[in-house]
């Protein structure tokens, strides 16, 4: 069955036909865009209905954000923002903070607004504007109030001693190579996973996470996006994320679709051989619904975040001489890639 949608005007964003007045659809797929009379060859051969709900309105294409991370957004959007850039959000505007003194002043003000023992989560820190961060610096500002400062890249986080005690960081568990500097309260790249596993009771608390997903829906809708991509489903907790996304991003009040791409190394953590990854990824297809869809895609990670200056660079490298960090060494990454490649998966790699 065809449906012919009439509109006052359709902005196609196609130079060959910038404007039209009708769009013909079959089973959710656009068959043709143009003027109704041009669609007669289709209409003569198939049953169709005319839908005039947009007859007095202008239709324009929705945008696609292929790399959004809705779970990450749901975690950070409820946080307090201290960033070097202005953020215009549906619920308010955040003014930029571009120096270290301003960052500390804002952090102190936010700390004063929190109740005794109530943790403070801050997102948006970046060393190029806000200077070096450390446990000692945070404690100078917020004292023994549990405080978590998340880097702009999201690939690293800093905590004071109170926050580390709150989430149960055990110094004796920290081994060389874990990408954790316990003295600085710094958890980066692979070490971020250690921190997240202990932060999950706070950042994935049902009410908190649901509020974050509601904010995500507002942001996506206000930006005119009709499709987004989650390029690392499971980065926090695969089961919890999948269930929450199904609850909050599937329904008539959701104005967009989400393509889900699983975090490949999460599927095979705990000693599961990479060769079993495709089988585990295939099982996720059973979760597909109208707005949430896993495909034969997988996300893998190579090196650190560019925003954090932890990406691996070839010569001449970083000006100060430091080196980036591996999330997966080339040898390990190759094992995962080959497993999914031979299983026919499209592979997305963070580099």
Per-region residue spans from a language model:
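Accessory "access/gating" subregions that flank catalytic or transport cores
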Residues: 286-289
């Amino acid at each position: 069955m065809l449906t012919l949608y009439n509109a006052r005007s359709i902005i196609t964003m196609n130079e060959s036909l910038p404007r039209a007045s009708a769009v013909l659809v079959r089973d959710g797929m656009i068959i043709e865009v143009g003027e109704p009379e041009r669609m007669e060859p289709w209409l003569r051969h198939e049953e169709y209905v005319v839908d005039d709900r947009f007859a007095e309105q202008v239709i324009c294409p929705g945008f696609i954000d292929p790399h959004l991370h809705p779970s990450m957004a749901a975690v950070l959007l409820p946080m307090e923002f201290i960033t070097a850039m202005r953020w215009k959000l549906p619920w308010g505007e955040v003014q930029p903070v571009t120096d270290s003194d301003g960052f500390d002043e804002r952090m102190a003000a936010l700390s004063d607004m929190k109740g005794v023992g109530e943790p403070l989560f801050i997102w948006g820190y970046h060393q190029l504007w806000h200077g070096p961060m450390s446990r000692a610096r945070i404690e100078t500002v917020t004292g023994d109030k549990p405080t978590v400062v998340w880097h702009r890249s999201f690939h690293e986080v800093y905590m004071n001693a109170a926050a580390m005690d709150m989430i149960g960081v055990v110094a004796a568990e920290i081994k060389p190579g874990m990408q954790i500097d316990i003295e600085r309260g710094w958890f980066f790249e692979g070490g971020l996973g250690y921190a997240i596993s202990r932060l999950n009771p706070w950042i994935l608390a049902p009410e908190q996470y649901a509020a974050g997903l509601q904010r995500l829906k507002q942001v996506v809708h206000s930006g005119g996006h009709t499709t987004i991509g989650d390029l690392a489903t499971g980065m926090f907790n695969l089961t919890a994320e999948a269930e929450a996304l199904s609850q909050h991003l599937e329904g008539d009040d959701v104005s967009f679709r989400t393509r889900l791409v699983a975090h490949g190394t999460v599927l095979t953590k705990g000693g599961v051989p990479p060769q079993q990854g495709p089988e585990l990824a295939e099982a996720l297809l059973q979760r597909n619904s109208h707005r949430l869809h896993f495909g034969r895609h997988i996300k893998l990670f190579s090196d650190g975040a560019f925003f954090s200056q932890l990406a691996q660079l070839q010569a001449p490298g970083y000006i100060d001489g430091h080196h980036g960090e591996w999330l997966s060494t080339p040898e390990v990454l190759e094992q995962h890639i080959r497993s999914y490649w031979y299983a026919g998966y499209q592979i997305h790699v963070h580099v």
